[in-house]
C-alpha cells in the first residue's frame, strides 16, 4: 500500500502539529492496520485508503491542539480508534482510554496497541454507563457517539473535577446545545478546518457546573 506520506505531512503542517518521523510512521502503520482489518471487521464505511487520511487521521488529529492541560483522556465509543489512537500517537504524554462495547472493535484496538507499542493507551470493552475506572478523566471526547445531552448524561460519573468535554461534531450543533441539561455549560464552540475534508467540523467544549 502507499503510505500517503506527503498528504499526511502536509495535513500535519496545516494543523500546526509538529510530529517526529517515528510518530508519522506510527500513524501510517495504524492506517495500514485499519485498511487491513476493515475488510472483515467493518470498522469504517470509508474504504478508500486516501480518504482515510483526511477523514480519520487528520480529522482525529484536529482535536490535539485543543487538549492542552489534559493528562487523562477518555474516547467514548472509540470504534476503530478515532480520535483516540491518532491522539495518543501525537501526545505520548497523555494517558488515553479507548472505550467501546463492541468486542470486535476492541479486539482490533488491542491489536493496534500491541503492534504499535502504545504504552499510554488502554482499551476497555464495556458500556459507557457501566464503566467504573479507578481514576476519572480530565478530558472526555467522542466522535459521532451520540447527541450532546446523551453524551453528558452517560459520562458524568467519569469526569474528574475541573475536567472538560471536547466533543467532535460536524455542523454547528445549535439544537443539541439547546437541549443540554442544567448543570452543563458550553464554554466554547470552535470551528475546525480539516485538511482534505470538504465538510464542516466543530469542537464543543463543555464543563460541569
UniProtKB/Swiss-Prot annotation:
Q: Does the keyword Cytoplasm apply?
A: yes
Q: What is the native source organism of this protein?
A: Chromobacterium violaceum (strain ATCC 12472 / DSM 30191 / JCM 1249 / CCUG 213 / NBRC 12614 / NCIMB 9131 / NCTC 9757 / MK)
GO cellular component entries: cytosol
Enumerate the catalysed reactions. Answer: guanosine(527) in 16S rRNA + S-adenosyl-L-methionine = N(7)-methylguanosine(527) in 16S rRNA + S-adenosyl-L-homocysteine
Instruction: Specify whether Ribonucleoprotein is a keyword of the entry.
Output: no
Any one GO MF annotation of this record: rRNA (guanine-N7-)-methyltransferase activity
List the protein's name.
Ribosomal RNA small subunit methyltransferase G
Among InterPro entries, the record links this protein to: rRNA_ssu_MeTfrase_G, SAM-dependent_MTases_sf
**The entry's keywords:** Cytoplasm, Methyltransferase, rRNA processing, S-adenosyl-L-methionine, Transferase
Q: Which family does it belong to?
A: Belongs to the methyltransferase superfamily. RNA methyltransferase RsmG family.
Write out the function statement from the record: Specifically methylates the N7 position of guanine in position 527 of 16S rRNA.
**Where does this protein hold S-adenosyl-L-methionine?**
77, 82, 128-129, 143
Location(s), subcellular:
Cytoplasm
Pfam family membership, one: GidB
Give the enzyme's main class according to its UniProt record, as a single word.
Answer: transferase
What EC designation does it have? Answer: 2.1.1.170
Where's it mainly located?
A: cytoplasm
